[in-house]
Regions:
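Active-site-surrounding "flap" and adjacent substrate/cofactor-binding loops of secreted or lumenal enzymes
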Residues: 87
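A structural signal for small-residue-enriched, beta-sheet-centric alpha/beta enzyme cores
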Residues: 1-77, 81-84, 92-334
Length: 334
């Protein structure tokens, strides 16, 4: 059984930080998910145009078994530079894979993925640099992260309306926690064109938009400029997982993306999901029970990913010609 929750803190073992550049030709940013003491990592890339870094290291056959942080960032391939800033900050703290005899001789392991938001602030050359990574890392905290048009979600757009950064978490009956941090920036739509409802509203928490609101949403979708996009995210858990299991979690989390966005995984998207497991809590005591418990964790990963997509869209605020969902359909939230 899944229990959704709204805590003041990120689940144990992780910190999240944003750096946002909004205004004066800027509309982009960077988000860092920091794993305290490192975490087992996995990844699944399904979009047709991904922009990633260090994803090969997460394959179960490679030697690296602990990930220090994951960077989610705007700026398309240019934005991968933000990971350099995170590496520099971690190196200064002596955090990373040891490669020498001295404590400071480390290589921080920092996978990254990007969204396409180039030029959305008005200046094509304004995109994240290594400084963005440094500032996002410095801002990392165990407090529940701000969501909406912040960090990597600052310049996010989906199907003609404003996207954003979202966060959701849940706790399984076993006590294992699962959370997702997602940047919703899709070529597809997050809105059911017939009803005007958000695909991700699986619990029917929101009211149905009025006829004028549905028309406004349909117009925004029809006028949307089709361009490169990408939805990216990190599933976090305090469960003890192997690298193979972490990769499976990342793969199944894409089911949540598919529930929230239609179509998804297009040739215009670079959809990428990471999984980080802090290995603080066992999912079950024996192998048979562990398989059933792991299945529950997989289902939870998909659910929280969809919920984080919903959160990112609802928390977003309009920028320029991109109105937010709640601006176009204010009655849905009362």
């Amino acid at each position: 059984m899944l229990t959704s929750r709204q805590n003041e803190w990120v689940i144990e073992g992780f910190e999240i930080g944003h750096h946002t550049a909004d205004g004066d030709g800027w509309l982009t940013g960077t988000t860092v998910v920091l794993a305290q003491g490192g975490a087992i990592g996995g990844v699944d890339v399904r979009g047709g145009g991904p922009g990633t870094r260090e994803t090969d290291l997460l394959h179960p056959t490679t030697v690296i078994d602990r990930i220090d942080a994951v960077v989610l960032t705007g700026g398309s391939a240019y934005g991968l530079a933000a990971a350099n800033g995170v590496m520099a900050g971690l190196e200064a703290a002596g955090i990373g894979w040891p490669v020498g005899l001295e404590p400071h001789q480390v290589v921080p392991i920092v996978p990254a993925a990007v969204i396409f938001d180039l030029g959305r602030g008005g200046v094509f050359g304004n995109r994240p640099t290594d400084e963005f990574g440094k500032l996002a890392l410095a801002a990392a905290t165990v407090q529940r992260p701000e969501t909406g048009s912040v960090g990597a979600g600052t310049g996010a757009v989906c199907g003609g309306i404003k996207g954003g950064f979202g966060y959701a978490e849940t706790e399984l009956e076993s006590g294992v926690s699962v959370a997702a941090a997602v940047v919703v920036n899709a070529a597809g739509s997050v809105v059911d064109s017939e009803s005007g409802r958000l695909w991700a509203d699986r619990r029917r928490l929101l009211a149905t938009p009025s006829d004028p609101e549905r028309e406004a949403l349909a117009t925004a979708h029809a006028q949307a400029q089709r361009s490169a996009a990408t939805t990216i995210g990190v599933v976090m858990t305090d469960a003890i997982l192997t690298k193979a299991q972490a990769n499976k979690v990342a793969a199944v989390a894409h089911d949540g993306m598919a529930r929230a966005i239609r179509p998804v995984h297009s040739m215009f998207d670079g959809d990428t999901v990471f999984c980080l497991a802090s290995s603080r809590r066992s999912v079950a005591e024996d192998q048979i029970r562990s398989l059933f418990a792991f299945n529950s964790l997989l289902a939870a990963a998909a659910d929280v990913f969809a919920d984080a997509c919903l959160d990112g869209v609802l928390a977003a605020s309009g920028r320029g010609s991109w109105k937010s969902y709640t601006e176009l359909a204010p009655s849905v939230v009362g």
